[in-house]
Amino acid sequence: MQQLNPSEISEIIKARIDNLSVTTEAQNEGTVVSVTDGIIRIHGLAEVMYGEMIEFEGGVYGIALNLERDSVGAVILGDYQGVAEGQTCKCTGRILEVPVGPELQGRVVDALGNPIDGKGPIDAKATDAIEKIAPGVIARQSVDQPVQIGLKAVDTMVPIGRGQRELIIGDRQTGKTAIAVDAIINQKGTGIKCIYVAIGQKASSIASVVRKLEEHGAMDHTIVVAATASDPASMQFLAPFAGCTMGEYYRDRGEDCLIIYDDLTKQAWAYRQISLLLRRPPGREAYPGDVFYLHSRLLERAARVNAAHVEKYTNGEVKGQTGSLTALPIIETQAGDVSAFVPTNVISITDGQIFLESDLFNAGIRPAMNAGISVSRVGGSAQTKVIKKLSGGIRTALAQYRELAAFAQFASDLDEATKAQLNHGQRVTELMKQKQYSPQSVAEMAVVVYAANEGFLEDVEVAKMGAFESSLLSYMNSSHAELMAEMNTGAYSDDIAGKLKGALENFKATQTW
């Protein structure tokens, strides 16, 4: 029988102790109690923060949204099929971040910044949190530079400035997305970056928009963030915040960016769905009590920031430049009801609205903008000089025409002044029509509006207004290129007005339309 030597035993124990590596890793863990419709109830996670990312088995992540006394309610990001009751999960100590930077331009990404266009991975150099506090009062600057949309009706009557929030509101199929896409196409060559956030739309509709942007060479300066109708409610809820963070990258570096949320009604629906599944008490129209805060904290991040903010943010790399994030949120109404909960909320948050009507759209007036109730609260100070000077009479002419047209249906004999107003209004209405994907320059708008104001249209047949406009613009661009270039800078003077009048008289004499 072999005998054990006590010294050998002590040596073995010493060696074992020396080789033992004790690493203590404290992790805040919890157990999945239930999984229902993308909502997960977790027992434990005592130290979890609101909005913190939670890691589940299989590399799936969620966000903590409900912190209750004995449980945590979390929403899953992506597919929840692999998560089961009894599994463990742990806090990550991080809040949700998305990639930002110029590497994303020309790409289609999901709400987490992952590419979904099949063009390979995105090598973004930086990431940023999706939930950020909006710039304070001191960091802001007043809106005084224009964003040209390229649509006569919008740029003359409801001008939009850099850093403004202008709501596009209307029923389905009234041309809301068309205005937004035209706005993106018109930013080509201006240096304004664009972000198009598609929320809860059909994948085929998003693909169609991307194809149109590519056709018109607008994808190079655009990021598309897509949360389709088949994506979970959590992705539709987060997509606008992700897009906003990508836009803030440019704003805080002294650049200009335009972001379109298409549309926030579907984000509110997704948030309502999440809130009801989390058992939060429902309020008006079953929306949770904080649905106003959902949109206000998102839209307040669209702003014009001053040079001091940009310099501080970039640690002195960018000096003397202001940055801006301009938002065009879209809201879909049901049967023209703008007094519903979400439309009234967003109207009160934004700096004006473009109201689109089904009746006008069906009558062939496109963009189908109601000039009477569409308004821009801050854009007037950002309008270019030439458009501001010339466009004053357009809104009045249209408003008077709508009023008189309703009255003229019942009146049999009208005086000459009323007839003249009706004729003028008819022609201005025709003039405000514009084909999709054909944005106009400042000079082209100025020529058309000047012709309307100075009575050059009164003897042109209403049916021939479209032909008159296209002939006039091709004549001006070919024969008066210098004058057009001067007006494109926004300049306007008596000298320019005189030249413009002479050019229009010469064109009218040719009768070539």
From Swiss-Prot:
Enzyme class: translocase
Domain of life of the organism encoding this protein: Bacteria
One term under GO cellular component: proton-transporting ATP synthase complex
Sample GO molecular function, one term: ATP binding
Record's catalysed reaction(s): ATP + H2O + 4 H(+)(in) = ADP + phosphate + 5 H(+)(out)
Repeat keyword on record: no
Ranges that cross the membrane: none
Cellular location(s): Cell inner membrane
Assigned EC number: 7.1.2.2
Main location class: membrane
The keyword Oxidoreductase appears for this protein: no
Residues of the site described as Required for activity: S374
Key words, A-Z: ATP synthesis, ATP-binding, Cell inner membrane, Cell membrane, CF(1), Hydrogen ion transport, Ion transport, Membrane, Nucleotide-binding, Translocase, Transport
Topology within the bilayer: Peripheral membrane protein
Known function: Produces ATP from ADP in the presence of a proton gradient across the membrane. The alpha chain is a regulatory subunit.
Subunit structure: F-type ATPases have 2 components, CF(1) - the catalytic core - and CF(0) - the membrane proton channel. CF(1) has five subunits: alpha(3), beta(3), gamma(1), delta(1), epsilon(1). CF(0) has three main subunits: a(1), b(2) and c(9-12). The alpha and beta chains form an alternating ring which encloses part of the gamma chain. CF(1) is attached to CF(0) by a central stalk formed by the gamma and epsilon chains, while a peripheral stalk is formed by the delta and b chains.
Family: Belongs to the ATPase alpha/beta chains family.
Record protein name field: ATP synthase subunit alpha
